[in-house]
C-alpha cells in the first residue's frame, strides 16, 4: 500500500493528548478532519498503526490534533517526530488543474524548452506555494506557484513549463 506524508508530529500541546503537527499538505482541513483515519509512521519510517482524528484546530503555523482514545500526554509523548500519512486509496479526486504535492515533486522544470532543474520541495510561506527547484551547479531556484510564472503542468510527461520574471533568478 502506498502512503503519502501529510504532517510530522513535532511536540505535545498541553496535558490532554493534543499534538503539534507541522503540516505538509495543501488539504490540512480535510486530512485532519474529525473521524478521518491516518497512518502513523515512526522515526525510521516504519508503519506503527492507524489512528483516528478526534479533534483538530489551527494555531499559528501548526495543526493541533488529538487521536481518538488517547486523551493524556502520557499516551502520545512517544509519537514526537513521527510522521502522519494518508493511504493512497483515501486521496480524494481533485478538480482539473489541482495537484497533490507528491505529483509535483520530482517534475522537471523547463523555460523555453531548456531544462532548469527538478522540483524537490514545496514550501507554504503564505498566499501561494513556492516550488524549490534543484539545479545542477547553481543554487536552488524558488519558484512561486502563480499563473504568470507557471505556464503549464503535464504530470504524464513529468514536465512543468515556466516563464521566470526578470529578477527572480539571481544566477542568470
Swiss-Prot record:
Domain named PRC barrel: residues: 96-168
Domain notes: The PRC barrel domain binds ribosomal protein uS19.
Record's keyword terms, sorted: Chaperone, Cytoplasm, Ribosome biogenesis, rRNA processing
Name of this protein: Ribosome maturation factor RimM
PANTHER family reported for this sequence: RIBOSOME MATURATION FACTOR RIMM
Protein's cellular compartments: Cytoplasm
Subunit structure: Binds ribosomal protein uS19.
Location (main, coarse): cytoplasm
Cysteine pairings via disulfide bonds: none
Lineage start: Bacteria, Bacillati, Bacillota, Bacilli, Lactobacillales
Species assigned in the record: Streptococcus gordonii (strain Challis / ATCC 35105 / BCRC 15272 / CH1 / DL1 / V288)
A single MF term (Gene Ontology): ribosome binding
GO biological process terms held by the UniProt record: ribosomal small subunit biogenesis; rRNA processing
Amino acid at each position: 500500500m502506498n502512503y503519502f506524508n501529510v504532517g510530522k508530529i513535532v511536540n505535545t500541546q498541553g496535558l490532554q493528548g493534543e499534538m503539534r503537527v507541522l503540516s505538509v499538505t495543501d488539504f490540512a482541513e480535510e486530512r485532519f478532519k474529525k473521524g478521518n483515519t491516518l497512518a502513523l509512521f515512526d522515526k525510521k519510517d516504519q508503519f506503527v498503526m492507524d489512528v483516528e482524528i478526534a479533534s483538530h484546530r489551527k494555531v499559528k503555523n501548526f495543526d493541533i490534533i488529538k487521536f481518538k482514545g488517547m486523551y493524556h500526554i502520557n499516551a502520545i509523548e512517544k509519537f514526537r517526530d513521527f510522521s502522519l500519512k494518508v493511504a493512497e486509496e483515501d486521496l480524494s479526486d481533485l478538480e482539473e488543474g489541482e495537484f497533490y504535492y507528491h505529483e509535483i515533486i520530482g517534475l522537471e522544470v523547463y523555460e523555453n524548452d531548456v531544462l532548469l532543474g527538478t522540483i524537490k520541495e514545496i514550501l507554504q510561506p503564505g498566499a501561494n506555494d513556492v516550488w524549490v527547484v534543484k539545479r545542477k551547479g547553481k543554487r536552488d531556484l524558488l519558484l512561486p506557484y502563480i499563473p504568470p510564472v507557471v505556464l503549464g503542468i503535464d504530470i504524464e510527461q513529468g514536465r512543468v513549463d515556466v516563464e521566470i520574471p526578470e529578477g527572480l533568478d539571481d544566477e542568470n
